[in-house]
Amino acid sequence: MNREQIADALRQNQVVAYPTEAVFGLGCNPQSESAVKKLLDLKQRPVEKGLILVAPSLDFFRPFVDFEQINDEQLSRLQGKYERPTTWIVPAKSTTPHFLTGKFDSIAVRLCDHPSVKALCEITGFALTSTSANLTGEPPCRIADEVRSQFGADFPVLDEMVGRAHNPSEIRDLRTNQLFRQG
């Protein structure tokens, strides 16, 4: 499928697969509880774990992130360019849905400059949820055909290439810089 078709599917609260910096991600509209539920069911992922949001700029995260709790140094770190994709655990607004934050008062966000992510966010006007496109026990998908093999020929997949990163994103706490997952 092309970008417009995937954007339409996202607007219709479907779960889609799209390329990121290293692997294909599964994503949906983060403001749609029904879409997020479909995503969690598909991944067999407990809601308590929370989800990552990706977007090309901080503006897409404004509905979810409590920027008043982030100081200038932390903001610089959040906006920084790194050798590997980096996801940051940041303070969530009290209004951010629990189906996104899980059992936490924070949310995971990643600024992503992959052209596919940038285009989908700009076309739809919202950030995307991001979890690796793979079934439990299977390796993350790196090409569109692997996504179709795991999720079915009719699954909405953006037929574009992943970036050059070798590993999924590193995950760090923005306030403490604690490493949760090595990238």
From Swiss-Prot:
It comes from Haemophilus influenzae (strain PittGG). Belongs to the SUA5 family. TsaC subfamily. Keywords: ATP-binding, Cytoplasm, Nucleotide-binding, Nucleotidyltransferase, Transferase, tRNA processing. It is found in: Cytoplasm. Residues 1-183 form the YrdC-like domain. It catalyses: L-threonine + hydrogencarbonate + ATP = L-threonylcarbamoyladenylate + diphosphate + H2O. This is Threonylcarbamoyl-AMP synthase. One of its GO terms (cellular component) is cytoplasm. PANTHER family: SUA5, THREONYLCARBAMOYL-AMP SYNTHASE. GO terms for biological process: regulation of translational fidelity; tRNA threonylcarbamoyladenosine modification. Pfam families: Sua5_yciO_yrdC (PF01300). Its EC number is 2.7.7.87. One of its GO terms (molecular function) is tRNA binding. It comes from the Bacteria. The gene is tsaC.
